[in-house]
């Protein structure tokens, strides 16, 4: 569990190290606000994305299921600045095992609420789905803008990073993978 008191002290000291007066009017509550914000933003640290699949059903459905444009935000573990974008998840049920659609979005939410790398986030979402449903195929695509590339360093706002993970049928069969990509990219 996060230690809010310890976080507040560290933020207070950080403000001092910047040369600021943490006791001035505009900053006196900042350590508390920032600590509470980080506790919320990193709330996925003590959760498992796989545990979000609480509703698994046996249906007579053997065709692809796609949930796309799932908005998310996360924090780059290298610079502790946000990256945000959309996740797209496709899976081909195995023996008719399907899940509630919101469970896919919840898995993204939990996996993204921690210091993270986009590549790892993509893999964690795919692994959670594989563990929960054991589908015939999984395809996860995440596209995001990273503030560490927008606000600092190279300063290229609007640039997007795309990561994918393909498993099962979507890894082994190039035609099937192309079909999923085409469906995801349709407006």
Curated annotation (Swiss-Prot):
Do you know which InterPro entries this protein is assigned to? Answer: GTP-CH-I_C/QueF (IPR043133), GTP-CH-I_N (IPR043134), GTP_CycHdrlase_I (IPR001474), GTP_CycHdrlase_I_CS (IPR018234), GTP_CycHdrlase_I_dom (IPR020602)
Q: Does the keyword Metal-binding apply?
A: yes
From the record, give the cysteines joined by S-S bonds.
none
| Origin superkingdom | Bacteria
Which GO MF terms does the UniProt record name?
GTP binding; GTP cyclohydrolase I activity; zinc ion binding
Q: Which PROSITE patterns match?
A: GTP_CYCLOHYDROL_1_1, GTP_CYCLOHYDROL_1_2
List the GO cellular component terms. Answer: cytoplasm
Matching Pfam families, A to Z? GTP_cyclohydroI
Kindly report, in one word, the top-level EC class recorded for this enzyme.
Answer: hydrolase
Which UniProt keywords are listed?
GTP-binding, Hydrolase, Metal-binding, Nucleotide-binding, One-carbon metabolism, Zinc
The record's listing under SUPFAM superfamilies reads: Tetrahydrobiopterin biosynthesis enzymes-like
Q: What is its EC number?
A: 3.5.4.16
Pathway involvement? Cofactor biosynthesis; 7,8-dihydroneopterin triphosphate biosynthesis; 7,8-dihydroneopterin triphosphate from GTP: step 1/1
What range does the record give for the signal peptide? none
Reaction catalysis annotation: GTP + H2O = 7,8-dihydroneopterin 3'-triphosphate + formate + H(+)
List residues binding Zn(2+).
76, 79, 148
The family note in this entry says:
Belongs to the GTP cyclohydrolase I family.
HAMAP family, per database record: FolE (MF_00223)
Q: How does it assemble?
A: Toroid-shaped homodecamer, composed of two pentamers of five dimers.
Name of protein: GTP cyclohydrolase 1
- Its gene is folE
